[in-house]
C-alpha cells in the first residue's frame, strides 16, 4: 500500500499587475487568504520587500507545510510554491492567487511528494 504525504503545487504567474507584485501587504493578504481557503493552519509568516524596483519574497509556515511567493515586478512574474500535507484543498491556492494577482496566464504543476513510500 502506498501513501502520499503531501502535494506540492508549483504556480508560475505571467502578466501580473506590476503594482501588486511590489505591494508586500497585498501579497501577504492574498497568501493568507489562499492558506485559509485550503483550511491550513498558519503558524507564522515572513515577508521581505527588496529595494528599488525589486519585488517581494514571502513565506507562510503552515502546520501542514508552507506557501511561498517570489515576485519580479519588472517581468510581471510571480513564482509560488504550495506544499500541503493531508487532504487540504491545494487547488484553492491557484484559484485565489490567480484572481488576486490579476494574471494573464498561469502554469500549474502538482507533484505528489513521497509517492514511492510504502506502508505496511
Please tell me what each predicted stretch does:
Residues 1-120:
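Polybasic/polar functional segments that serve as interface/processing modules
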Amino acid at each position: 500500500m502506498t501513501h502520499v504525504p503531501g502535494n506540492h503545487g508549483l504556480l508560475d504567474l505571467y502578466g501580473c499587475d506590476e503594482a501588486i507584485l511590489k505591494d508586500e501587504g497585498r501579497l501577504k493578504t492574498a497568501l493568507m487568504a489562499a492558506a485559509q481557503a485550503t483550511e491550513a493552519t498558519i503558524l507564522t509568516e515572513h515577508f521581505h520587500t527588496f529595494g528599488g524596483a525589486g519585488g517581494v519574497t514571502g513565506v507562510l509556515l503552515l502546520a501542514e507545510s508552507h506557501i511561498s511567493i517570489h515576485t519580479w515586478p519588472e517581468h510581471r512574474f510571480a513564482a509560488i510554491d504550495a506544499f500541503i500535507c493531508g487532504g487540504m484543498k491545494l487547488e484553492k491556492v491557484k484559484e485565489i492567487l490567480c484572481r488576486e494577482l490579476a494574471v494573464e496566464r498561469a502554469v500549474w504543476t502538482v507533484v505528489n511528494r513521497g509517492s514511492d513510500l510504502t506502508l505496511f
